[in-house]
Amino acid sequence: MSKTSNKSSADSKNDAKAEDIVNGENQIATNESQSSDSAAVSERVVEPKTTVQKKFRIESDLLGELQIPSHAYYGVHTLRAVDNFQISRTTINHVPDFIRGMVQVKKAAALANRRLHTLPAQKAEAIVWACDQILIEERCMDQFPIDVFQGGAGTSLNMNTNEVVANLALEFLGHEKGEYHILHPMDDVNMSQSTNDSYPTGFRLGIYAGLQTLIAEIDELQVAFRHKGNEFVDIIKMGRTQLQDAVPMSLGEEFRAFAHNLAEEQTVLREAANRLLEVNLGATAIGTGVNTPAGYRHQVVAALSEVTGLELKSARDLIEATSDTGAYVHAHSAIKRAAMKLSKICNDLRLLSSGPRAGLNEINLPPRQAGSSIMPAKVNPVIPEVVNQVCFKVFGNDLTVTMAAEAGQLQLNVMEPVIGESLFQSLRILGNAAKTLREKCVVGITANADVCRAYVDNSIGIITYLNPFLGHDIGDQIGKEAAETGRPVRELILEKKLMDEKTLEAVLSKENLMHPMFRGRLYLEN
């Protein structure tokens, strides 16, 4: 880039401030990324023409010059964003699926531009190599130091991606970082693109990948519940509605219902993920495809399908697709729904394990830590509790996504970054919560079969099974007397000679209580 000789004092101050910010950000990134990425980088670096080590390089943009750390693969636009958006201190470095999605877009664009002869072969080869360094070798995953909250509809991340890919490509060509007259972040890496089509497409790919991870975690969790259902299949217990005794069931049925609940959510999440495979790549600024060569729209989507292995398709109306964020609302709604089901299951686990002496105590959750600083021997259901809290956070994120989607204006929704922050966070924490619940709770659950059976034997709810023999009114009277006197239903029925003992025992047998079809056969025989 060309240097400005008469830099103002204001620019000098900005340089100093940016330098401080970058030094701090890079120290954080270095500490977090550990040594594996650094080793991979050192092994694959192509020696540049100049080997003299400098602490900084100078890059300039519309606003002037900035000093960029010489080791950094990002450039001046990224540094501006780091300075401007010090909001959450959570950076794109922590969202690898998003980084990969953006880089996949850059690779597909290079392939399409080469096939249409708008990008020279050598540049295309260098860009593709650079993208593969990130996608396959996982290099430079720590070179995205911008905050997840950012203005500009994602321009900062798009610029960041362009710069990292460009500087890696320059390395491939044997040039120094920042020698953009050889290969330019915008003119070459961003060729035939706008932030307004590359960013949402990369976003969709990242969310799609995150959904696959969440679906896999939910699948493992539902399998764990199913195994417990099989383990508890012969344990009879009372079912409850409105926290009152209802009719008997098996503990296995209760746990299999948890599994079926989660399996249903997998289907919903897959459908939501598939909606993300319609992209607006080729739309550029507002959907008209300005500055793209003829045929680019279909070429680039085909190339992106090759790069990702996904069946992507171009949106029917690119202007509509560029401004619409409905697919994100739908995706997060599916995530919220899964969180709602998971939270309800955790509520049930906490209730069923309550006690142990003054609660239901039908199941035992694995003890994970001491529960009180003042009450000895107390153990709390900390795993279901933390999952509940994660689900509440997902519910809040869903409202954020809804409000941000509604806030779009005319041909673009500039609020996509906060939609992305909410979606990626929900995917990450809900997936972690599902894994935690499975590993630290569900697989270790045991049943208190005697407690479960005692509740059934002492229940008034079993009177429901006698309706075909006694009628509802007599059942009411027996149930009321049992509640008032504390006497068992069986005893009152026999005392009043309302049924013979053989029939009563058959109807109230464990077989019939767990499989009520038996009662139907008995009724027909009579």
UniProtKB/Swiss-Prot annotation:
Stretches with biased composition (Basic and acidic residues): 10-20
CDD domains: Aspartase
Highest taxon, organism lineage: Bacteria
Residues at which L-aspartate binds: T155, S194, T195, N196, T241, S373, K378
Region (Disordered): 1-44
GO molecular function ontology, one term from the record: aspartate ammonia-lyase activity
GO cellular component terms given for this protein: cytosol
Family: Belongs to the class-II fumarase/aspartase family. Aspartase subfamily.
PANTHER family attached to this UniProt entry: ASPARTATE AMMONIA-LYASE (PTHR42696:SF2)
Protein name: Aspartate ammonia-lyase
